[in-house]
């Protein structure tokens, strides 16, 4: 019995959840610092919205699907650089994060086990004068032990 208690305590310590948003350590590769194994199956989530935007316009997108507790989204150019700025639409459930630039990442805020999300809407503003393809990459956390890293994507053409 004592061994089971020690094992349970060790497992509880090794899995960290970030209910107040993704940590800056996740900026580079969008990997949560949960200490659990990531999923390689097709994620039950998608990013929906227009597939093109002018460089002087704001783009509104929605991450949706099955229930989830956390997320982290970046827009990346063809050279895998994080580009553009996010604007929060739902300030109860999302916040921006400064990874390589101001407001260049959006993540969850105040995730609670009993109150999962099924969707989150956000705005993105392209860099001034930018033209080309941008890939939105999302990590979605279903539970502390179940998450998909960068597998939820959407391609956008910026004109």
Curated annotation (Swiss-Prot):
PROSITE patterns: REELIN. Residues 18-159 form the Reelin domain. One of its GO terms (cellular component) is extracellular region. Residues 1-17 form the signal peptide. The keyword Ribonucleoprotein does not apply. GO terms for biological process: defense response to bacterium; defense response to protozoan; innate immune response; negative regulation of immune response. InterPro entries: Ferric-chelate_Red/DefProt, Reeler_dom, Reeler_sf. Pfam families: Reeler. Disulfide bonds join 27-99. It is found in: Secreted. Keywords: Antibiotic, Antimicrobial, Disulfide bond, Immunity, Innate immunity, Secreted, Signal. Belongs to the insect defense protein family. PANTHER family: CYTOCHROME B561/FERRIC REDUCTASE TRANSMEMBRANE, DEFENSE PROTEIN L(2)34FC. May have antimicrobial activity. A late response immune regulated gene that is negatively regulated by spz during the immune response. This is Defense protein l(2)34Fc. The lineage of its organism: Eukaryota, Metazoa, Ecdysozoa, Arthropoda, Hexapoda.
């Amino acid at each position: 019995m004592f061994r089971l208690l020690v094992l349970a305590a060790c497992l509880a310590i090794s899995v960290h959840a970030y209910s107040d948003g993704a940590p800056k350590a996740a900026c580079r590769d969008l990997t949560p610092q949960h200490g659990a194994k990531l999923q390689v199956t097709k994620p039950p989530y998608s990013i929906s919205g227009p597939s093109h935007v002018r460089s002087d316009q704001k783009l509104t997108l929605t991450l949706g699907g099955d229930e989830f507790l956390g997320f982290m989204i970046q827009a990346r150019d063809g050279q895998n650089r994080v580009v553009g700025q996010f604007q929060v639409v739902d300030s109860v459930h999302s916040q921006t994060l400064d990874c390589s630039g101001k407001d260049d990442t959006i993540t969850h805020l105040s995730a609670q086990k009993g109150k999962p999300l099924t969707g989150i809407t956000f705005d993105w503003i392209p860099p001034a004068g930018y033209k080309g393809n941008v890939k939105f990459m999302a990590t979605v956390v279903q539970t502390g032990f179940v998450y998909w890293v960068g597998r939820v994507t959407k391609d956008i053409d910026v004109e």
